[in-house]
Amino acid sequence: MLAPRGATFLLLHLALQPWLGAGAQATPQVFDLLPSASQRLNPSVLQPILTDPTLNELYVISTFKLQSKSSATIFGLYSSADHSKYFEFTVMGRLNKAILRYLKNDGRIHLVVFNNLQLADGRRHRLLLRLTNLHRGAGSVELFLDCTRVDSIHNLPRAFSGLAQSPEAVELRTFQRKAHDSLEELKLVVRGSLIQVASLQDCFLQQSEPLATTNTGDFNRQFLGQMSQLNQLLGEVKDLLRQQVKETSFLRNTIAECQACGPLSFQSPTPNTLMPVVPAASPTPPVRRCDSNPCFRGVRCTDTRDGFQCGPCPEGYTGNGIVCSDVDECRYHPCYPGVRCVNLAPGFRCDACPVGFTGPMMQGVGISFAKTNKQVCTDIDECRNGACVLNSICINTLGSYRCGPCKPGYIGDQMRGCKMERNCRDPELNPCSVNAQCIEERQGDVTCVCGVGWAGDGYICGKDVDIDSYPDEELPCSARNCKKDNCKYVPNSGQEDADRDGIGDACDDDADGDGILNEQDNCVLTHNVDQRNSDKDIFGDACDNCRNVLNNDQKDTDGDGKGDACDDDMDGDGIKNILDNCQKVPNSDQEDRDGDGVGDACDSCPEVSNPNQSDVDNDLVGDSCDTNQDSDGDGHQDSTDNCPTVINSAQLDTDKDGIGDECDDDDDNDGIPDLVPPGPDNCRLVPNPAQEDSNSDGVGDICEADFDQDQVIDRIDVCPENAEVTLTDFRAYQTVVLDPEGDAQIDPNWVVLNQGMEIVQTMNSDPGLAVGYTAFNGVDFEGTFHVNTQTDDDYAGFIFGYQDSSSFYVVMWKQTEQTYWQATPFRAVAEPGIQLKAVKSKTGPGEHLRNSLWHTGDTSDQVRLLWKDSRNVGWKDKVSYRWFLQHRPQVGYIRVRFYEGSELVADSGVTIDTTMRGGRLGVFCFSQENIIWSNLKYRCNDTIPEDFQEFQTQNFDRLDK
């Protein structure tokens, strides 16, 4: 028997030689992550390990137990500064899932989902997570559970590439223990092979497919073949050793009973009793006793007068007590159908119930036990555990489940979820308040917006006298716009309240609460009882950004709290003003292509020398390079227009190829044409050559909820198809003075509030504009107009389609009839009421344009009156009005409406004019102080309104007659 056994171990040694050599080349480095471990890894060591460029593979091993259906984050790496995630592994017991979250190099979180895992079932589990290709190639993740690989995912973004470089920036957090939960082991392993790491959990991996190789050279095809042979060989060795043990035991007992081996022989009158047989001519032999251990191990031995007597074989064995052989209980099928039965010596064990079933562990000894105790596996009803999204149909099947469509009354799918069906056209499905407008969004979602003169969340709306989107009284809802307006009769969409006394600054006589009324206070919004003012400008030291330099404009270009008048680096680009070729525009590179001493970043003619930067027409193009040749009339001269013959005032060029989207056949340059085959592109602005569309709704997966991928969802994006415009913002604006010369020149004083959504003009000034820098094609523009004084009765309004100071549309409102006090160059008479004018001035800013704007009517080569409110009613002091403008320059459509409270008081109807084919937005004032433009909103919109078609039909019918 020694020769076969020796040969077996010799063969085993030879087979293990390659494996032993490989193991010697890559010894695993193990770091314990548990708080209680004496060798716990210091968090400061984590960052150098994980960002080591030579490390292309790592392992995380853990042993834990979670209560049934519970969820827990087993381990994670986080930013010490803002607690954002770098790496996190979470078990979601109720969903039978595990999720790996990690930070990609673009700063976004990537999710890897492992499905159909029973990790939270009250049992102890061993988990091994293997990450490969950390620094080279496409990443991959393998998950091993209880020594079996359960999932592998490849072609993933690399992990740890976005990890902070500072060692102190990484924080390790481990399992937060709850009652009946335990975390026995949590280790980080680097280097070494998968087999070596698995052995740390007493796992000898059995896999149905070759292990994934890595780029480190740990394994090769030859080694994998050897490992496969080694698996087979070890199984054979195990069976051989078990058989040899049985044979050795049998031989020992046979020799003990053999008559030829000595003077004694035994015969057994009964199966369990040995009696000596004495030959006739021989002397009486000695009687054998129990002290010679004649019985099988564990069998009771009893000495009798005639010899020894062995008891029955132990449970799980069969024989005469001297020789006992293991019983194979698996032949009696004690395990659930399909579950592997493992025969033990003695006894048997059943593997865990199949995926989709649950049941207790099954283990026993003996034929009787195997016959009378069968493993019970009960189907798991995944539909009770939230396997499908809420409010969807879930169909439970034996060992599995299937998710169906949304339940009746709900819409959506398994990707987006099932939400209660809402429909603006069906009164029973319309969730909005009776005082709200119901809007159907691109994805079929419904949004509720309180109507004019009402405020709230859209589902609940309350009265809003000043039309600033805040209700007069508190509403029973949680949205910001449900809070009570802190200035009931003065629009203040930002609800600013410097002294936090519950009264908004817009209506608080002492806004800073220092006991000094605003009119006498040199710091209206800053508490300063002493009113100290070192430089004698109009701002006290407490709020003056240049305490020792007179600067009434308080201009602070770089927003560093130091006014431009006393800041030696106004734009904060690190270059002193005296050396900076763009003092108010950051340009650390100081590039100056035309060598005129003005940097390209602020040069109105970057390729033509113009050191004086003269721009007479205020179109942001210097006179030296301004041709005023604009073939399509969109406000951009042909030499700089990215679509010279196609109207596109916005100049959007998504793929930055120099061709505007309006004339580009492939806006995102992904090889899929926008409109023609093999298009149309289901994500026109985001590259997606594969055109994935999981729910077949015609919108690609990558741009499903954010069409332009500007990180602002379409529902709140003011321009969902323009990544450069996301929110209404007039904080950056251009001032345009329309009468720049005069003896009593007073320019407007503009104050911007509420993050660019509210503008206030405080001076009784000459005509002027505050114009935003964003240009639009089609646009909807709305806002609240309010004159917060009882002084004066002149013009206020807004502009659109601004191309230069001689070309724009203006909507202006005069309170009373009045003749302009300067009759030169002509007598101008203003009538009360709302007027819509097209300005196309040959002279530009000056007395001709000034008087033409004042005059109600057409003026040659200056202004055309497109529409006037026939009511001839002027605006009222301290009353709020809401305007809505629609402009579609591609067809010349213009319509403007005015509301007083919730009542429509003026409507221009459809007006057609193509003088300006798009442009910028802004506000207008002429000799009127204390004007508020509040709750401003603009939205890109090229959709032609339905009433345009009706207008065309009526006009054609008129022509036919």
UniProtKB/Swiss-Prot annotation:
Q: What is this protein called?
A: Thrombospondin-4
Q: Report disulfide bridges, numbered on this chain.
A: C290-C301, C295-C310, C313-C324, C330-C341, C335-C350, C353-C377, C383-C394, C388-C403, C406-C418, C424-C438, C432-C448, C450-C461, C477-C482, C487-C507, C523-C543, C546-C566, C582-C602, C605-C625, C643-C663, C683-C703, C719-C940
Query: What are its GO biological-process terms?
Result: behavioral response to pain; cell adhesion; positive regulation of cell division; regulation of tissue remodeling; response to endoplasmic reticulum stress; response to unfolded protein; tissue remodeling
Which keywords label this protein? Calcium, Cell adhesion, Disulfide bond, EGF-like domain, Endoplasmic reticulum, Extracellular matrix, Glycoprotein, Growth factor, Mitogen, Repeat, Sarcoplasmic reticulum, Secreted, Signal, Tissue remodeling, Unfolded protein response
Stretches assigned to the TSP C-terminal domain = 731-945
Give the location of motif Cell attachment site in residue numbers: 562-564
Spans of repeat TSP type-3: 463-495, 496-531, 532-554, 555-590, 591-613, 614-651, 652-691, 692-727
Q: Where in the cell is it found?
A: Endoplasmic reticulum; Sarcoplasmic reticulum; Secreted; Secreted, Extracellular space
Protein's organism: Bos taurus
Spell out the Gene3D superfamilies in the cross-references.
1.20.5.10, 2.60.120.200, Laminin (2.10.25.10), TSP type-3 repeat (4.10.1080.10)
Q: Give residue spans, biased composition: Acidic residues.
A: 660-671
Q: Which residues are glycosylated?
A: N612, N941
User: Major place of localization?
Assistant: endoplasmic reticulum
Question: How does this polypeptide assemble, per the annotation?
Answer: Homopentamer; disulfide-linked. Interacts with PTBP3. Interacts (via EGF-like 3; calcium-binding domain) with ATF6 and facilitates its processing, activation and nuclear translocation. Interacts with NOTCH1.
The task this protein performs is described as: Adhesive glycoprotein that mediates cell-to-cell and cell-to-matrix interactions and is involved in various processes including cellular proliferation, migration, adhesion and attachment, inflammatory response to CNS injury, regulation of vascular inflammation and adaptive responses of the heart to pressure overload and in myocardial function and remodeling. Binds to structural extracellular matrix (ECM) proteins and modulates the ECM in response to tissue damage, contributing to cardioprotective and adaptive ECM remodeling.
Gene Ontology terms, MF aspect = calcium ion binding; growth factor activity
Q: Which residues form the signal peptide?
A: 1-23
User: Where is coiled-coil annotated?
Assistant: none
Query: Per its UniProt entry, which superkingdom is the organism in?
Result: Eukaryota
Identify the coding gene: THBS4
* Region spans: Disordered: 581-671
**Stored SUPFAM superfamilies:** Assembly domain of cartilage oligomeric matrix protein, Concanavalin A-like lectins/glucanases, EGF/Laminin, TSP type-3 repeat
Protein family membership: Belongs to the thrombospondin family.
What does UniProt give as GO cellular component? collagen-containing extracellular matrix; endoplasmic reticulum; extracellular space; sarcoplasmic reticulum
